[in-house]
Amino acid sequence: MNYSIRVKKREKVITMYIDDYKRWLGAELEDPALTDELKKIEGREGEIKERFAVALKFGTAGLRGILGAGSNRMNIYVVRQATQGLANWVKTQGGSRLVAISYDSRINSDVFARNAACVLAANGIHVRIYDALMPVPALSFATRYYKANAGIMITASHNPAKYNGFKAYGPDGCQMTDDAAAVVYAEIQKTDILTGAKMMAFEDGIAQGLIEYVGEDCKEALYSAIEACAVRPGICKTAGLKLVYSPLNGSGLVPVTRVLHDIGIDDITIVPEQQYPDGNFPTCPYPNPEIFEALRLGLELAEKTGADLMLATDPDADRVGIAIRCPDGSYELVSGNEVGVLLLDYICQGRMEKGTMPKRPVAVKSLVSTPLADIVAANYGVEMRSVLTGFKWIGDQIAKLEAAGEVDRFILGFEESYGYLAGPYVRDKDAIIGSMLICEMAAYYRSIGSSIKARLEAIYAKYGRYLNKVNSFEFPGLSGMDKMAKIMASLRKTPPVELGGYKVVKITDYQDTAQTGLPAANVLVYRLEGGATVIVRPSGTEPKIKTYFTTLGKTLAEAEAQEKVLADALKPILA
């Protein structure tokens, strides 16, 4: 291609997004904040390009982006366009022609949820929407409870405050399938972003019976379903557990404390600065229970009160992080992998003791989660299934068991990123049941003169000292995705033969479905001499490449030393 043609093509692209910008600027937008933002960036090509050169792409996880004006930002027009695309798909599905909606505490989450309801109602689709913020598991449950065609959760999970998102669920309460998402995306592309979505006033939708609030019967059924999954019912009532809990200014406060009170935990101190919904997340810019800074206030309060446990749930309350009190009075954070292994061990041990373990039990974990779980599962005679990253794949395994009439075989699903599910009542991770079972586990070990810490050390003593660490490399901006793609392509074209002096003995490329037997995924697994593994994959929701290290040593220090060597070896490759 000669220089003049390249210049003309670039000029055409610039003209397109500048034209889109001018169209938005000249429109009578319902949100004056969007108009103000557009005026401020007038003449600033880079700012305009970031907002209009591309559109947020709808996938199986829906949409997620920075709040603001333009097709590459989260705003009421992007939400309406996405909902119209979803509505077009729902109208082809038959059945109830109903969609369930929930939302978290993020900026404009309630506004986006109501806008989605208005679009659906205008399309003749019935809506069941929560009357107040409720978390991901509540949305998944309502979708199943009302036999809805789909569900919408307005959230950006644990992202910083400037983000929001639109998660779409299928009729089983699991994230939407690839095929369905592709159809919805095609319908979105046919819909003009400013004028293409049908709209009805929310009050008119209520008056016509098209929009209804989720009933108390559904809410109570959720709590009952969670509490029915207790391993040792009643164990918490006499344990005297002292708890500090933080909902991180998100949606977990009401459902988590309700269930904990129901099972007998009354001594719960809420972190006051993080108690109530606040989408600005003023005390933790990254409201992520994996990050120490998000837990800092909770840990400080735990030290003051002498709490046995500190729990924190992310804004949409599908993930929970914990800290445990050690014998010397200090607090230790427990990783998602460690909690997953502890819960697996506790559930197996308890259900065998109580005679409630199903025949041929099944547990499911993501392939990036610790291999220690496989060893623990085998010890109890549990089939451990490893699936691609993303809880929808765990939900898919539950659906397969359900289709075979064997859903009772499912005992636990978990991801290393602090997501747990111990029952088939929903199809996404659930911090409510995670919190309940963690507390129940602590109560049980106290009742036998032990502790979560002691049990974890006993597991390591029996199976080996596994260390699991996750690092992230961020690639912001429009060029970020291209950089990530080039890095992954380079790793495939020129695979490393060693990392940090450790020979690579096997490479598994999850894009090769014949090799893995799983759907294609952009994941590379390196197995090293001595048993360590390194996994590299781009995040599915954020502009970053994640690396997962699993090392095994006789001591923690030995495992940590190997992890550091491997992490240092990867840095220049992913820089």
Where are each of the predicted segments found?
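Glycine-rich phosphate-binding loop plus the immediately following alpha-helix
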Residues: Y169-M199, N337-R360, K365-V376, A431
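Short, Lys/Arg-enriched N-terminal segments with co-localized hydrophobic residues
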Residues: Y3-T15
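Conserved phosphate/anionic-ligand binding catalytic regions in large, soluble enzymes, centered on
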Residues: F52-N72, A156-N159, L243, P247-V259, ...
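Short Gly/Thr/Asp-enriched flexible loops that form oxyanion-binding sites at enzyme active sites
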Residues: V111-L120, Y163-G170, V256, D318-N337, ...
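N-terminal small/polar loop signature for handling phosphorylated ligands or for N-terminal nucleophile
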Residues: A100-Y163, H261-G321
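Phosphate-binding and adjacent anionic-ligand microenvironments
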Residues: E303, A307-L309, S330-E332, G350-R537, ...
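Gly/Ser/Thr-enriched, mixed-charge loops and adjacent short helices
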Residues: E47-L56, N164-A302
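An N-terminal, well-structured beta->alpha segment
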Residues: Y21-A116, N123, I206, I211-A239, ...
